[in-house]
């Protein structure tokens, strides 16, 4: 089985993720077999019932209680997803994350032995509620984190906040200047994945012999790293790296957003990021190579 692309759909509660999924299915489910993974935080999954009313060309795996993104249930989530892929054999996967989820945790799932050769993260969509964004972003730092790692940001419900749309675009660009931004009503957008400034993956046409054999490693640390040592770390990983993204705390006190495609890396200082270092590196790695250990060693120099 070829490696399957996974599209991750994030956004706070009520931002329009399920409506976006409906639109996505209307666009593509007639031409490809789509596996839908819903990561609901409640015990009863209402959204999957809503989606199934228009079922055509897709299957649903209900993952309740936020289990896909919960480290304590990581094993069972991997088994469920692996079984789902084997049974359904979809052309692609679309995961709707719960509104309370931290999207980077998906990297821990995809790097599991059962999945790392079957699934790769293709694109991260984040829906932003134009009406309630200012209230939510003050209360939930996780919302800002969802915005920061997105490839495409969809500012939804713009018809209900017309006077604030320009300001919202400005505020969101401050959080993530690299993502493509689309203004939408009822989550209707263009699905042209070539529009984002920093697309998560190279286009299929640029990959020889089909999709690459890719893995992902999530690096986490409570320690600080100097700018010089970080540059040395990036030089080491660049040969096997296709995509890197996340946040790093420096010894200078600065917090930087790492964005990388192949051997090209950018580091941008960010404000209001209060969390340990956490970033994902995706690519083809030598066996048993641990970027976590390498990063830890660079922190201790």
Whereabouts are the PLM-identified features?
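C-terminal accessory "lid"/substrate-recognition subdomains
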Residues: 2, 43, 145-275, 285-289, ...
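Nucleotide-state-sensitive switch-loop elements of NTP-binding domains
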Residues: 2-10, 15-136
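Alpha-helical segments flanking ligand/cofactor-binding loops in enzyme cores
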Residues: 26, 144-145
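Charged helix-capping and loop-helix junction motifs
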Residues: 138-141
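Flexible loop/N-cap segments at domain edges
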Residues: 281
